[in-house]
Amino acid sequence: MGKEKTHINIVVIGHVDSGKSTTTGHLIYKCGGIDKRTIEKFEKEAAEMGKGSFKYAWVLDKLKAERERGITIDISLWKFETSKYYVTIIDAPGHRDFIKNMITGTSQADCAVLIVAAGVGEFEAGISKNGQTREHALLAYTLGVKQLIVGINKMDSTEPPYSQKRYEEIVKEVSTYIKKIGYNPDTVAFVPISGWNGDNMLEPSPNMPWFKGWKITRKEGSGSGTTLLEALDCILPPSRPTDKPLRLPLQDVYKIGGIGTVPVGRVETGVIKPGMVVTFAPVNVTTEVKSVEMHHEALTEAVPGDNVGFNVKNVSVKDVRRGNVAGDSKNDPPMEAGSFTAQVIILNHPGQIGAGYAPVLDCHTAHIACKFAELKEKIDRRSGKKLEDNPKFLKSGDAAIVDMIPGKPMCVESFSDYPPLGRFAVRDMRQTVAVGVIKAVEKKAAGSGKVTKSAQKAAKTK
């Protein structure tokens, strides 16, 4: 086997009919975790339903349907391999909770792949003022996904097919608007593809002899190639934040007979190991970690990205819950947030939002109502420049700096210190009405919380 390949996460974005599913399906189909038997089964079903033209999107439809119904599908289905990486597709839009998932995302995407359709009129629809292309790209950038690849899809349906002129026109247009958002087009690979026919997906296309390949220049090293797969190989691997203090938002807390209380969650920053004394915020409970395990194997330490369960001493299941955050009691322990200042972008709200609005915030694993206490300034959502002080209202499309107060104790962090704990989705009327990143947190001075005996003992022996 040799050394395992690095894992990277991508998010696939673009307008509803750009061909995201077909393109993603193609990659999973050709390089991924779907076994031949499943594919044959899908093909047979497709033929019976008269969807013989199914090709790849069908694969994704099947997987999506299973995901939507909450069937835990074998997650390998959303993985594929390049020569350098194991790639996981964290989410593909079209999924109901896509925006929420992208923000509270169980994991941060390392790169966004933007698919735009080159067909006559299609590109224009996707990029128009109300097309989703812009919104997705803006979201990705706001949420800290700084690497981008653009797949110019459906090259087989341009007039004439595989038109170089059309490709160049689109590259020019897309470059202009991703630049406005904040991406540097020199660092972005633009690849003309057909997710359906496979042009430039895994192998160079004989249909576009004019295409001399894509090039990117960046300080971390430049790259060039012809296919989408090669562009994925050029993604810079993430540096996992092991050197930061520990932050581990809890997803669940279990009571396991003979073992005791076992909180479960994903390490976002830092490391957790047996013997460490951890503090849970906002409940302010401090105790010793007895053991850490992942997939039923004991670990000497868990690092960012690991989903772990850890056993804690003298803490009852009633003391800690989902949405709490564990951290190292001796190294910038997490604390309750009294209030925080955030930059929010209103995505789709039918009316106006004024001070006093109190929707639910989804931030890491916490789900808590927060009040928009003060609208401080309205800003230009691309440049961040101030447009007006103390606006009375905000409406869809606006960006603003807002002071927020949690309705119940909550632990959040500024995006610059701990990115996964510093971005949130604002939910109201069963949809995501806004997204935000936290600029600053006013932490509550912790009173004397519960410190278990084992924590006191551990402190003495150190």
UniProtKB/Swiss-Prot annotation:
Molecular function per GO: GTP binding; GTPase activity; translation elongation factor activity
Entry keyword Hydrolase: no
Modified residues (N,N,N-trimethylglycine): G2
Pfam families from the UniProt entry: GTP-eEF1A_C, GTP_EFTU, GTP_EFTU_D2
PROSITE patterns for the chain: G_TR_1, G_TR_2
Region annotation G3: where it falls in the sequence: 91-94
Modification type 5-glutamyl glycerylphosphorylethanolamine: residues: E301, E374
Matching SUPFAM superfamilies: EF-Tu/eEF-1alpha/eIF2-gamma C-terminal domain, P-loop containing nucleoside triphosphate hydrolases, Translation proteins
Sequence segments annotated as region (G4): 153-156
Region described as G1: 14-21
Chain positions covered by the region annotation G5: 194-196
GO (cellular component) term, any one: cytoplasm
Keywords in alphabetical order: Cytoplasm, Elongation factor, GTP-binding, Methylation, Nucleotide-binding, Phosphoprotein, Protein biosynthesis
Domain named tr-type G: residues: 5-242
UniProt cross-references to Gene3D superfamilies, sorted A to Z: P-loop containing nucleotide triphosphate hydrolases, Translation factors
InterPro entries: EFTu-like_2, G_TR_CS, GTP-eEF1A_C, P-loop_NTPase, T_Tr_GTP-bd_dom, TRAFAC_GTPase_members, Transl_B-barrel_sf, Transl_elong_EF1A/Init_IF2_C
Chain sites annotated for binding GTP: 14-21, 91-95, 153-156
GO biological process, one term: translational elongation
Domain of life the protein comes from: Eukaryota
Region (G2): 70-74
CDD domains: EF1_alpha (cd01883), EF1_alpha_II (cd03693), EF1_alpha_III (cd03705)
HAMAP family, per database record: EF_Tu_A
Family label: Belongs to the TRAFAC class translation factor GTPase superfamily. Classic translation factor GTPase family. EF-Tu/EF-1A subfamily.
Task performed by this protein: This protein promotes the GTP-dependent binding of aminoacyl-tRNA to the A-site of ribosomes during protein biosynthesis.
Protein name listed in UniProt: Elongation factor 1-alpha, somatic form
Organism in which the protein naturally occurs: Xenopus laevis (African clawed frog)
The organism's taxonomic lineage, starting at the top: Eukaryota, Metazoa, Chordata, Craniata, Vertebrata
